[in-house]
C-alpha cells in the first residue's frame, strides 16, 4: 500500500477540489474541481490532504478530462485498492500558489468572511459564500453578531453597481443595498 507523506499544514490551506472515487483499475481517481476552469486543478502538482492523523501530501502524476468530469493519477498509487484510502478527501493547495490577479479582481476565498456593510454604515452580516448563477455571481450574506437583523441576503456581485468597495485589510465590503430588502 502506498504511504502518504507526512507534511506540515500549508501556510494558507485552500480547498481546490475533492477526490470523489476510484476510476478504473490502475490507481486513477475521479475529481471534483472548484477551480475555474475545472482543469485548473491540474496546474497544482503538489496537493495536501487532511487526514485523521494530520496533513499529508501527494503529487499529481497525470490528469485529464474524462466525459464531463476529471480523472487523475497520483504518484505512488498504481491500483484501485491503494487509492480507496484517499477517496472522499478534499484537495488543498497553499493559497500562495495562486496566480496574482489584476487590481480589483478577487478570488472567492478572499471575499468569504468579509463584513458586509451598506454605504450608510449598516452591518448586514458576513459573506458566507458566493454562488455562480449564470447571469452574475451572487454573494450570500449571513447575519453575524451586531448585524442589522438575522436575515440571510443574496446580493448580486456587481462591482460598481451593488458592490461599491472591497477592503481586504479591513475585512469589509461596502454595498449599495437596502437593509429592509
UniProtKB/Swiss-Prot annotation:
Any one of the GO BP annotations: ribosomal small subunit biogenesis
Annotated coiled-coil segments of the chain: none
GO CC term (a single one): ribosome
Ranges of residues in domain PRC barrel: 103-181
Presence of keyword Amino-acid biosynthesis: no
This protein's record includes keyword Hydrolase: no
One GO MF term: ribosome binding
Cellular localisation: Cytoplasm
Keywords from the UniProt entry: Chaperone, Cytoplasm, Ribosome biogenesis, rRNA processing
Pfam families on file: PRC (PF05239), RimM (PF01782)
InterPro entries assigned to the protein according to its UniProt record, in alphabetical order: PRC-brl_dom, PRC_barrel-like_sf, RimM, RimM_N, RimM_N_sf, Transl_B-barrel_sf
Tree of life domain: Bacteria
NCBIfam families, per the entry: 16S_RimM
Protein function: An accessory protein needed during the final step in the assembly of 30S ribosomal subunit, possibly for assembly of the head region. Essential for efficient processing of 16S rRNA. May be needed both before and after RbfA during the maturation of 16S rRNA. It has affinity for free ribosomal 30S subunits but not for 70S ribosomes.
Subunit organization: Binds ribosomal protein uS19.
PANTHER family linked to this entry: RIBOSOME MATURATION FACTOR RIMM
Family: Belongs to the RimM family.
Domain statement: The PRC barrel domain binds ribosomal protein uS19.
Annotated protein name in UniProt: Ribosome maturation factor RimM
Organism whose genome encodes this protein: Marinomonas sp. (strain MWYL1)
Amino acid at each position: 500500500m502506498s504511504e502518504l507523506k507526512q507534511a506540515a499544514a500549508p501556510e494558507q490551506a485552500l480547498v481546490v477540489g475533492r477526490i470523489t472515487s476510484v476510476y478504473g483499475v490502475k490507481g486513477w481517481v475521479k475529481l471534483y474541481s472548484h477551480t475555474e476552469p475545472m482543469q485548473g486543478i491540474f496546474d497544482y502538482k503538489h496537493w495536501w490532504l487532511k487526514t485523521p492523523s494530520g496533513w499529508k501530501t501527494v503529487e499529481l502524476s497525470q490528469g485529464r478530462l474524462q466525459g464531463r468530469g476529471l480523472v487523475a493519477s497520483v504518484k505512488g498509487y498504481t491500483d484501485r485498492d491503494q487509492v480507496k484510502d484517499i477517496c472522499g478527501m478534499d484537495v488543498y493547495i497553499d493559497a500562495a500558489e495562486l496566480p496574482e490577479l489584476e487590481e480589483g479582481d478577487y478570488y472567492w476565498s478572499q471575499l468569504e468572511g468579509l463584513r458586509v456593510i451598506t454605504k450608510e454604515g449598516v452591518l448586514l452580516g458576513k459573506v458566507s459564500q458566493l454562488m455562480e448563477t449564470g447571469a452574475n455571481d451572487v454573494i450570500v450574506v449571513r447575519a453575524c453578531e451586531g448585524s442589522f437583523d438575522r436575515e440571510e441576503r443574496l446580493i448580486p456581485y456587481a462591482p460598481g453597481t451593488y458592490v461599491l468597495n472591497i477592503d481586504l485589510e479591513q475585512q469589509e465590503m461596502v454595498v449599495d443595498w437596502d437593509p429592509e430588502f
